[in-house]
């Protein structure tokens, strides 16, 4: 059987390509396209024999797309126009132009691809761009299903909720198709149990607008589930984290850590410890959770990813509760006892499902590695969706 000809758009460091390999379907990437020169260096390093086009997607003509004669499109368009933190410019954001170009080209191709897989951030599912995508693929004759999935559903201790769409060129619906619904779990094709739907359920974590350099005098007063216990976490948040840590279907973080790391270069500097102590999401190697790593990890603290406590037999709570009424120097001394460090780029790649052989050229800096991985996707989640789509 001829391998599928796959077009990888917005290829980044090659997450989709790794997922395609992991899925074990007969396929070959005929071209990968990305305009990011640093990401392309990493892609070439890992896939030296794949045709990589370093150009804008808008610059590719219908004739050039036709010449590639692809059976499958894997793509992860820019997410900034749809992020919760961004301006949510949607179609008016210039970064959406390349994707609108794809939607314009798709119906005019000499040969339509049989399969499409798209990944984006949560928020894409309520965008006008998504509506245009659905309209376009429906008009072309695709059957499709949308998902909101996190790696935790595959036993990976990292929350990274993302939007996915899989589409197949055929007249009969997909066996698990739920029209108008966004599925919140992988389809159980053989099961008769109803799927979990997103419906109107918005698990919005309330954004905390917190000023850095908060004093440790315990003066914040709340009650019940909103009570601030220690750090800036409510009882409800701590309960949620404890629940995640007791979910035995999820692996421990220690399974994803490097053994021979030079920890010192990844330790949080004293200044950051003092300034952001109350905002850190601290995990231990035995935890079964970590928050989403973003492209700002290693440069910014708040909301960019978890940090690892490497000191054993030290209770975070005890350290934090002992900070009251101490001078800044004494607070730093206490916080340093925890030996908090950033996850290394390799460890984040492990959590994202990249294979052990995945690597970076030496000239790519640690900051660049964090940035590239923060923009990437979870390989295992995509691999499973490719398998489901191909079946």
Swiss-Prot record:
Keywords: Cytoplasm, Methyltransferase, RNA-binding, S-adenosyl-L-methionine, Transferase, tRNA processing. It is found in: Cytoplasm. It comes from the Eukaryota. Its EC number is 2.1.1.204. It catalyses: cytidine(38) in tRNA + S-adenosyl-L-methionine = 5-methylcytidine(38) in tRNA + S-adenosyl-L-homocysteine + H(+). GO terms for molecular function: RNA binding; tRNA (cytidine-5-)-methyltransferase activity; tRNA methyltransferase activity. The keyword RNA-binding applies. One of its GO terms (biological process) is tRNA methylation. Residues 4-391 form the SAM-dependent MTase C5-type domain. GO terms for cellular component: cytoplasm; nucleoplasm; nucleus. Gene3D superfamilies: DNA Methylase, subunit A, domain 2, Vaccinia Virus protein VP39. Ubiquitous. Higher expression in testis, ovary and thymus and at much lower levels in spleen, prostate, colon, small intestine, and peripheral blood leukocytes. S-adenosyl-L-methionine binds at residues 13-15, 34, 57-58, 76, 376. The active site is at 79. InterPro entries: C5-MTase (IPR050750), C5_MeTfrase (IPR001525), C5_meth_CS (IPR031303), SAM-dependent_MTases_sf (IPR029063). Belongs to the class I-like SAM-binding methyltransferase superfamily. C5-methyltransferase family. Specifically methylates cytosine 38 in the anticodon loop of tRNA(Asp). Has higher activity on tRNA(Asp) modified with queuosine at position 34. This is tRNA (cytosine(38)-C(5))-methyltransferase. It comes from Homo sapiens. The lineage of its organism: Eukaryota, Metazoa, Chordata, Craniata, Vertebrata. The gene is TRDMT1.
């Amino acid at each position: 059987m001829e391998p599928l000809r796959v077009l990888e758009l917005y290829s980044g460091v090659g997450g989709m390509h790794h997922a395609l390999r992991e899925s074990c379907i007969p396929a070959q990437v005929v071209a990968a396209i990305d305009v990011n020169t640093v990401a392309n260096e990493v892609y070439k390093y890992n896939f030296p024999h794949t045709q990589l086009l370093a150009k804008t997607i808008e610059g590719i003509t219908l004739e050039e797309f036709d010449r590639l004669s692809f059976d499958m499109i894997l793509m992860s368009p820019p997410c900034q126009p749809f992020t919760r933190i961004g301006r949510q410019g949607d179609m008016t954001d210039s970064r959406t132009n390349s994707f609108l170009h794809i939607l314009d080209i798709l119906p005019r191709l000499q040969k339509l691809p049989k399969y499409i897989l798209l990944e984006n951030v949560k928020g894409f599912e309520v965008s006008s761009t998504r509506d245009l995508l659905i309209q376009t693929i429906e008009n072309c004759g695709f059957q499709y299903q949308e998902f909101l999935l996190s790696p935790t559903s595959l036993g990976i201790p990292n929350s990274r909720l993302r939007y996915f769409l899989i589409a197949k060129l055929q007249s009969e619906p997909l066996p698990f198709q739920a029209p108008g619904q966004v599925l919140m779990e992988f389809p159980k094709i053989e099961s008769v149990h109803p799927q979990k739907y997103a419906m109107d359920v918005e698990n919005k974590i309330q954004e905390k607008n917190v000023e850095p350099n908060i004093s440790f005098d315990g003066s914040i007063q709340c009650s019940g589930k909103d009570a601030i216990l220690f750090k800036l976490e409510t009882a409800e948040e701590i309960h949620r984290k404890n629940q995640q840590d007791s979910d035995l279907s999820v692996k421990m973080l220690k399974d994803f850590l490097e053994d021979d790391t030079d920890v010192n270069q990844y330790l949080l500097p004293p200044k950051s410890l003092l300034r952001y102590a109350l905002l850190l999401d601290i995990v231990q190697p035995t935890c079964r959770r970590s928050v989403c790593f973003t492209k700002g990890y290693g440069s910014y603290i708040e909301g960019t990813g978890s940090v690892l406590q490497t000191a054993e037999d030290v209770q975070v709570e005890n350290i934090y509760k002992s900070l009251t009424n101490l001078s800044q120097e004494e607070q730093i001394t206490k916080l340093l006892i925890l030996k908090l460090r950033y996850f290394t780029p390799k460890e984040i790649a492990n959590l994202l499902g990249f294979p052990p052989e995945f690597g970076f050229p030496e000239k790519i800096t640690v900051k660049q590695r964090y940035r590239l991985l923060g923009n990437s996707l979870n390989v295992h989640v995509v691999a499973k969706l490719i398998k489901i789509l191909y079946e």
